Structure formats: C-alpha cells, structure tokens
Amino acid sequence: MSEDNLQMVVVQAQNCGVLHVYVQGNLEERGGKTIILTVHDIGTNHKSFVRFVNHPSMATVKEKAIFLHVCVPGQEDNSADFFGDFPTLDGIGDDLSAVLDKFEVKSAIAFGEGVGANIICRFAMGHPNRIMGIVLVHCTSTTAGIIEYCKEKVMNMRLENSIMSDGAWDYLLAHKFGGESKSRQEYLEELKATLNPKNLSKYLVAFTKRTDLSSTIGTKLETVDALLVTGSKASHLHTVYTTHKSMNKKKTTLLVVDNVADVMQEAPDKLARSLILLCKGCGVLSGVAIPGMERQRTLSSSMEEADRPRRMSVTQPHLPPVPSA
C-alpha cells in the first residue's frame, strides 16, 4: 500500500516513551482544517486508518482535515522487539495529550477502532477539554465476561512470554471478523508478515487486562458528542450495546451496519457519512457534503432529537451475480 506521502513524527511521551505519529495531510496548510486523531485496533497499525481515509467516500473530508494516526508502541511494520514494561491502555490514552501538544492542537475529533476506541475513550474521559467529538468503532467499555476471562487467562500464560499461540491467533481473528470470513487467511498472512508477534502479544495482553469504563463513562463523557459504530456480525456487538447503554443518549448516536463484521473495511461509505454528520454536529466540516443524502435518511435528526431511538441500522445491498463470459 502506498504510504500516501505520510510524514512520521516521533513524539516523546511519559508512559509510552515514544509514539510514532503518521501525519496524513499537509501541516503547512492546516489553517481552517479539522484535526482528526486516530488510534488503531490490535492486529493492525496506522495503515488501517490510512486505507479508510483514502476511500473515495472520504475524499472531501481528506481535503478539509489533517489526520494524526497514532501507532501503538511496537505495532509498526517490521518493528524491533519492544523492551521494558508495555504501557497500559490508560497510559496510552493519557499520552495522547502529548501528541496534541506536539502539534500545538488545542482540541480534535478523536477516532478509534476496537482497542483503539477503548484508548480514545480513556483519553476523552481524562481530557474532555481536548475533545470536540469522538468516533468509537467496535468499542468495548467492560472487562472480560467469565467465559472470555477464562479463555484470556489461559491465553495470557503464553502471551506473557511474548508467544502468539494458535489460540491467540484464533482470538485475534474472532476479534477482527466475528464469524467465518473469506478474508481471514489473507489477513492472517499479512499480519504475520508485517507485525512483530512479540509486540503484538504485548498489546493483546494490555487489552485483556483492561479496566472497566462502563460505570463512569456516562458521567465523564456527559458533554461529549459521540458516535458509536458496530457491524451486526461483529464479535463485540453486545459490548457496544453495553457501552451505548452507559452513555448520555442526548449526546450519543449508535450506528449498526447490518451484515458486516469489519465496518471500516466492509462499509467505509456508511462510516464516512456518519463521521461527517458527527463533525458537523461539532461545528466542523460544515462545507463538506454528506455522500448519499439523497438516497437515504441519515442520523442528522437523531443528533438533535433525544427522544427518538438512537439505533440506526444500515443494510448492505445485495449485489447481483457477475454474469459469466
């Protein structure tokens, strides 16, 4: 994949030591542009967000925004082994303020996927004055349930030694794809070829040791505009509902995309549309058109009318079969 002329900036941070931030957009032309801060999921890195931003549905947003893609320590392509104590999710989240300080950004739209969404949540809860709005894709706000806990306990015995066992790879695939998917093997091969498995195991351990957010997320994010996103086939669908249940319904919108597990890959146009709506509600990207508005009712009214149901379900179209030659 093309690096899209990304600029990599090293940021000194208290908990992570250093963070590699990949800037997508021209910082020299930042006047009037919206800053969007991103944090990726386990089993990927900043490139997952670069792919999303490069999707045609994001073209107008890309012109009006600058993206700061934060790479979790040790998750860069072909990274050297990470030595020392790996930061907690709280620690990574707290260090995001150092990223904004480095770029002299007072506040930003914060956007996370999976574990990255959990990290964004922690950042927003600790630094609400640095946030204009948050986008949380497949966000888990609770600790592991009893069944998941038992599986994670066994898995951690090997992960603590920086070993990605077959069970750990299976867990990662289920986390990413939910059920069966034709993309699983392709994803696994790319993952093993690019990411350092020892470092990947450390990020995974940090996630399995996450602390609960659900009891305080509602009060700490009471004034923050939030968009929660999930696919109906996502493995953590129920935890997204739990997160939504804990949040201020007047400030939070839930988007459920039917028949997909990985929203960023399988339904980028739906995600882009909802991102634009959130940004408009936060007073930014006002000049950006909303793709597909003429074909589909969107979330704009639900952002203003707290009494209406907050769930928006989007069904992917069934494409006709390709005719044989």
Swiss-Prot record:
GO terms for cellular component: cytoplasm. InterPro entries: AB_hydrolase_fold, NDRG. GO terms for biological process: signal transduction. Residues 296-325 are annotated as: Disordered. Pfam families: Ndr (PF03096). Belongs to the NDRG family. This is Uncharacterized protein ZK1073.1. It comes from Caenorhabditis elegans.
